[in-house]
């Protein structure tokens, strides 16, 4: 359960600020994400890749995940997996990024930060 919450928070952190993707984005490509839990009972760290195409962030295993990377690189997150939910925000710049995330799994609450590196 801890892994699913961290996974959900991690993936969601690249959902953008509500803009819509229109054509190729400067952030298109494969990115490696690292999520670190600073508070709560979630996994201490979690790593996984995502892909950005035309500003749309995707991961094949997430059911309720959608979003876009804003042209400015600003990002905001929201993802739900079963009874787990997470949100986050931050910024991509060039080939890296960072931000914060928080979420819950039932009554358990967790939060921390994320970093991203372009492949």
Language-model segment annotations:
Residues 18-23:
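Sec/Tat signal peptide C-region and signal peptidase I cleavage site
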Residues 24-119:
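Central antiparallel beta-sheet cores of small beta-barrel/beta-sandwich binding domains
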Residues 1-8:
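Bacterial N-terminal signal peptides that target proteins for export
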Residues 8-16:
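Bacterial N-terminal signal peptides
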């Amino acid at each position: 359960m801890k892994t699913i919450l961290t996974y959900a928070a991690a993936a969601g952190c690249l959902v953008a600020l509500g803009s819509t993707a229109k054509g190729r984005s400067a952030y298109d490509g494969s990115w490696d994400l690292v999520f670190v839990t600073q508070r709560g009972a979630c996994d201490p760290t979690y790593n996984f890749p995502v892909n950005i195409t035309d500003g749309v962030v995707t991961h094949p295993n997430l059911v309720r995940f959608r979003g876009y990377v804003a042209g400015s690189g600003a990002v905001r997150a929201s993802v739900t997996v079963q009874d787990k939910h997470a949100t986050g925000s931050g910024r991509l710049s060039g080939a890296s990024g960072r931000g914060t995330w928080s979420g819950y799994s039932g009554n358990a609450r967790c939060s921390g930060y994320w970093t991203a590196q372009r492949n």
